[in-house]
Every structure is written in C-alpha cells, then in structure tokens.
A protein has these predicted regions:
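Active-site/acyl-donor-binding loops of N-acyltransferases
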Residues: 110-151, 215, 219-236, 243-315
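Conserved acetyl-CoA binding element of GNAT-fold acetyltransferases
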Residues: 71-84, 223-234
Length: 315
C-alpha cells in the first residue's frame, strides 16, 4: 500500500471513490469548489493506493477562526472514504495521522469536526479528539403558531442573490461578540452559499439604510426549512429574520423550521419564547487541538463558540 498526498490529477479517482462510498456522483465543479476554491486555502488530502486502485481517502479543508480577537488558521474534518475491498484494514487512522501532521506543519491550531456515531468513538479514543458538545437541533413545529411567524413587521427583510461589502462591515461589528467562531466575512459567505454548486440557499438580510444589521441563510431539506446560518447585531434583528424564514416556510407548506444555536445566546432565548425547542437529532461536535493551549484559548469549551449548521459541511 502506498500513502501519499492528493493532488489535482487525482480528482477522477477521488470522485469515483466518492460515488462508490456514498452512492452519488460528485461533479468536477463540486470537488473544485470544496477542495481548491475555498477562501482559506486548498484542502489537505491524503490517499492510500493499492497499485492503481484508490483504497482510501481523508481530507481536511482550511477554515479561518476568530479566537479571542485574533484570526487563526484551523481546519474542518470531512470526506472520509474507504473502498469496500479495503475496509477493516485500519487505513483511516493512518491517513488521519498523516493529514493532521500536515495541518500542524501548516500552522493550523485545531481541526474541528462533526463525526457520526460510527466514527466518533475512534476519533476520541484513538486519535486524540475532544468532545466539545452534543449539539441538539433547535426546531419550531409551527402548527398553531403560524400566525406568530407571519411576516408582519419585517418589511425591511429583503432577499438577496449575493453578498456585498455591507457584509464585511457587519462582520467587523460582531466578530468579537463570541470568543470563538468561524470568520464570516463577505468572501467566505459568497463562497459558502452563493457559489455552492450543489445546494441552493436563500439569503435574507435586514437592511437598515445603507447597512445590513443581520442575515439569515435558509435551505429547504425535505419537509423542513433549515436556518443554516444567522448573524446579527442584536437578538431583535435575529428574531425578525427567523420570522421571515418561518413565514416563507409556511407559504411552502413546510411545518418545521430548524437550526443550531448556542444556548448561551440571547437570540436562542428569544427564539425559545417564539416556540423553538431543542431535540433530536443530536450532532457530535469535537475538536483536535494541534497547538499549545495558549493559542486555543477556550476553543474546547462550547460556551465560547458561535456555531451554526453552516460550520458543518453537511448542510
């Protein structure tokens, strides 16, 4: 078995393994968007080859974190694949350790991830990951509350196609509200949502003259509307944005609006008053520290995080 770093020429073999592992095709533009065009940098990919057969794949993609007033490099874990012929041979831990060594060498302070129930135990037991939180889904089952979620009073909420410079100003205003968060500047938002080749997101923003005081990103998934990301100057703005998303969901006949939001936030408490409740499914959130504790400064404590569905590569 040969282990080496992935490169652009391996794209066809990687997308072929993706189809075998997940039962769907990954288009060339999706692969390039995910691994080559991310604003924080190119993905770190490690591969296991059996002669000309791609047996295993693991990758992390760079992210910029805001940690207590400083932007620091980090990475998001994702896209773990082993060909069915080679499962049970221990390829994943070998690929993971190679990937983490490269990430540490590149200066990343941590790797963050959202493992499923199959991979969680091995990451924590064998690879040094730490549990940060089990994130519940915060859901509104509208029912009799439909009238409370209608669009009255949210006329200033507009729907946009792209992100302009006002979103950089919004980020500058709120970036140190929570001690730890993924950098949500205009460039990141444009890549993550407007340029995503596989998913369609709806961008809602509350305009206040020439500024934007908040945004919410929504995506339909089955019979639910997900608030994939939300960022705002204050809780009142957030409530107005969520009400707009809920009103849109109601018009589409969707009975549930769901999201992730840290329980320590004022907006979370206001949404609970509106009828949102935490529940299943619950998602593991873990980190692998790669730097000294002085550089992490509380990144292993969920109370410090601003976390939404957008921080996962699933939504």
């Amino acid at each position: 078995m040969e282990f080496r770093s992935g490169r652009a020429a391996d794209r066809d073999a990687i997308t072929g393994l993706f189809r075998e592992a997940f039962g769907r095709r990954m288009a060339r533009r999706e692969w390039e968007w995910r691994f080559l065009r991310k604003p924080a940098g190119r993905g770190l990919i490690e591969l296991a080859w059996d002669d000309t057969k791609l047996a295993g794949h693991y990758a992390v993609s760079p992210v910029r974190l805001r940690v207590r007033g400083k932007d620091v490099p980090a990475a998001l874990s994702g896209t773990t694949m082993t060909h069915v012929w080679y499962r049970g041979l221990g390829l994943f831990p070998l690929l993971a350790r190679r990937t983490y060594a490269r990430a540490r060498q590149a200066g990343h302070v941590l790797v963050m991830g959202f493992p499923n129930r199959y991979s969680h135990r091995g990451l924590v037991r064998d690879l040094g990951w730490r549990d940060v939180y089990e994130v519940p889904r915060l859901s509104l089952h509208m029912g009799d509350r439909r009238r409370e979620t209608e669009d009255g009073g949210v006329a200033e909420v507009v729907e946009l196609e792209r992100f302009d410079r006002r979103f950089d100003r919004l980020w500058d205003e709120v970036k140190d509200t929570c001690p730890v968060s993924v950098v949500r500047d205009r460039r990141y938002l444009q890549w993550r949502f407007a340029e995503n080749p596989e998913s369609r997101y709806r961008i809602f923003a509350l305009e206040d003259g020439r500024r934007v005081s908040g945004y919410a990103i929504a995506k339909r998934y089955g019979e639910e509307m997900h608030v994939v990301d939300i960022l705002c100057l204050n809780a009142d703005t957030g409530v107005r944005l969520v009400r707009r998303v809920a009103g849109t969901a109601a018009r589409l006949g969707l009975p549930v609006v769901s999201m992730w939001l840290n329980p320590g936030l004022e907006l979370r408490r206001e949404l609970e008053r509106l009828g949102f409740q935490p529940g299943a499914p619950v998602t593991y959130f873990c980190v692998l520290p790669l730097a000294a504790a002085s550089r992490l400064r509380g990144a292993c404590d969920f109370r410090n995080w601003y976390l939404t569905m957008a921080d996962s590569d699933v939504y």
